[in-house]
Every structure is written in structure tokens, then in C-alpha cells.
Amino acid sequence: MKTIVLCVLVLAVGASMALAQPCVDAAKEVAPAMSAEAKADLEKKLDEARRTALTVPNGGDADSTIWYGRRTGYTGRYKDTIAIFTKAIARWPQDARLYRHRGHRYITLRCFDDAIKDLEQAAKLAKGRTDEVEPDGMPNARNIPTGTLQSNIWYHLGLAYYLKGDFKRALNAYKECMKVSKNNDMLAATSHWYYMALRRLEKNKDAERLLEPINGDFEVIENADYLKLLRLYRGEVKGEALMSEIGDKAETLGNASLGYGIGNWYLYNGDRDKAMDVFRKITAGNQWASFGYIAAEAELKR
């Protein structure tokens, strides 16, 4: 009898410890698929960022540490990235950038509650301060950064809520993001997720009004896929036409972000079976860290 009681206690303690385990410790981590050449380039840049961060007087500064963390994330070492930013936050707890970047990588690891906590804190710290352009770690074709600290805080916060299925709070974050989206690329990206949140809440009139600025003269530098989706929502292109671009006949889809937007369009237009098929194809692919993949994964779990 004592043996049985002891076993029950051990199992209970083990279950309690499992429940208390931080999300990041239990999270799966999948490295991005890339060529050997691309991997070597990322590792070289990471090594440079690491050496810079470690050789700055007094153990580094926030700027060099941020680059060290970001470049660690580009290689797929997401847990290491979070550890770098966690250590940095202990040194510079008032730096909104650190919470913004750690929040992003919490999203990558599907730790949405942790991401929300960080991004809410980042928003508080950035409130009332002059916005700043956020340099790109992977520059676009024109080498023109399109995001700012505040737009990226609100964008990722909206995404974290969206991925949890909390579309009302996602909507509030995207409203704030629209206020600080000062170029077409950020407007396209924000409008895409904002529109989808509106449709999921059946606010169809508001969703239609949101698309009004996306006219024929609207151009972007790097967010071409989001612009294609906005034109789909406007009725200017067909879902089947966009699907054919990314291999609708294959077992997987070559573009998770575009695929998710199309799948979601099928979903809120009443074709759930087709939507689920698209989501399954996305998650059968290799774009594990992309927002489209994470969103498709979340839909399949709802």
C-alpha cells in the first residue's frame, strides 16, 4: 500500500513539475532550411556579432547585444536567442527593443503568452517616445528598412493575440500599428492581418473600408505577398490563381505566408474543408518559423 501511495505521489510531483515547466524549455525548435552557402554566411555574421558584443567595454552594450541575439535567431537557435535577450533585459530593463525582439522569438517557439507579456511591456516602455527606424538584419532589394520599433511592437503583439485566437485584442493592437505604419510595406503587412481579424469577427463592413487605400498605384518593396492577398480580398484576383503560383497540386506549399492568407480567405468565406487542406499543406512544408506556418498550425489545433 505504501508503495502505491509513493508511486502516486511521485507521479503527482512529476505532473506538477511538467505543468510548471516554462514554455520555452518544453518548446520544439526547428532550424530553418537553407543552402550550405546561406548557412555559412549567417554563421559568419553571427560570429562577427558575437565578437563585437563580447569585446565592447564593460561586457557589451544594448545595441551590440541586440544584433548578437538577432543573428543567433537567424540561424535557428531560438532558445539561445531568448537566453541572450533575457540576460540583456536584466542589465537594461527599460530598453523596449529587448522585449520586442524576445517577444518575436517567443512567437517562433509558440510561447504566445510569454510573447504577449513581453510585447505589452515593450509597448509601455515605448509609449510617448519618438519612434525609430529598425535596421534590417536581412535587407530588402533596395536596402531600405520598412519597419520601426513601435510598428514592430504592435505588429507582433497583434500577431501573438491573433495566433491565440483572441481576435478582439489582436484588432486593438493592429489599430495601434496602423497609426505608426508610415510606409506602404508596413501598411500592407498590417492591413493583411488587420483585415483577417476583422473578418474572423464578422466585421465585414469595416474590413471593406480598410481595403480602400489599396488601389492600383499602391506599391511595396518587400511585402509583395501581402499586397497580392489584399488584392485577393478586394476581389481583383482569384484564390485559385494565387494557389497555382505556390503549387496547389503538390503535397506542400512553397509559400506559407501567401498560402495561409488564401486558406483563411476560404475559411471565412465558408469553404472550411478547402481551408483545412491548405493549412495541412502548409504545415507539411519546411517553413516552420514563418508566421504563415505558425498561423496554419494554430488553425488546425482550434
Go through each PLM region and give its residues:
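N-terminal leader/linker segments that initiate helical-solenoid repeat arrays
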Residues: 19-67, 74-75
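Short coil turns that delineate tetratricopeptide repeat
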Residues: 57-59, 93, 127, 148, ...
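Residue-level recognition of tetratricopeptide repeat
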Residues: 70, 104, 159, 196-199, ...
